């Protein structure tokens, strides 16, 4: 498997999410590179970093969806949980000495691109709207500032 290449159709238009997705792609490519060196410790380090980063990305993404009131946030979170379970199984197999690198890279790349194009695309409008409301709210002085003006002139 060659290095993954970011494609424009993967952009959600939410810069912070796109940057996180790109970082995950970079990490999958690092896994590929570590595998070429055949150093177990280097591969283990990349797998751990990739899993940790993905978990934090999921938590961030889920918070954005919940804050935006996205109606399918619970279902989306379930998808994340199932994926985490699958990747955790690969981690255990790797720690037991099994060579799961190619299999794991294939799963990660297929799942990530499919997930971004299909599942993540569903929340984009709600999150973008929520984020624009936050920016608007901040530019208008925020909730407290508006309330103070309304009550005290």
Curated annotation (Swiss-Prot):
Query: Transcription regulation as a keyword?
Result: no
Q: Per UniProt, which keywords does this protein have?
A: Iron, Metal-binding, Oxygen transport, Transport
Read off the InterPro entries from this record. Answer: Bacteriohemerythrin-like, Haemerythrin_Fe_BS, Hemerythrin, Hemerythrin-like, Hemerythrin-like_sf, Hemerythrin_metal-bd
GO MF term set? iron ion binding; oxygen carrier activity
Detail which positions bind Fe cation 1: 21, 57, 61, 120
Assembly, per entry: Monomer.
Task: State the name under which the record lists this protein.
Answer: Bacteriohemerythrin
Q: Which organism is it from?
A: Pseudomonas paraeruginosa (strain DSM 24068 / PA7)
């Amino acid at each position: 498997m060659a290095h993954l290449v970011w494609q424009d159709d993967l952009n959600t238009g939410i810069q912070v999410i796109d940057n996180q997705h790109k970082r995950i792609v970079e990490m999958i490519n690092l896994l590929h590179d570590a595998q070429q060196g055949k150093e177990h410790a280097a591969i283990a380090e990349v797998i751990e970093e990739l899993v940790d980063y993905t978990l934090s990305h999921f938590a961030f993404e889920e918070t954005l969806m919940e804050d935006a009131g996205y109606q399918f946030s619970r279902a989306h979170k379930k998808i994340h949980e199932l994926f985490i379970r699958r990747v955790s199984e690969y981690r255990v197999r790797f720690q037991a000495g099994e060579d799961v690198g190619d299999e794991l890279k294939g799963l990660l790349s297929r799942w990530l691109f499919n997930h971004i194009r299909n599942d993540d695309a569903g929340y984009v409008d709600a999150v973008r709207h929520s984020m624009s409301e936050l920016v608007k709210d901040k530019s208008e002085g925020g909730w407290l500032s508006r309330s103070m003006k309304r009550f005290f002139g």
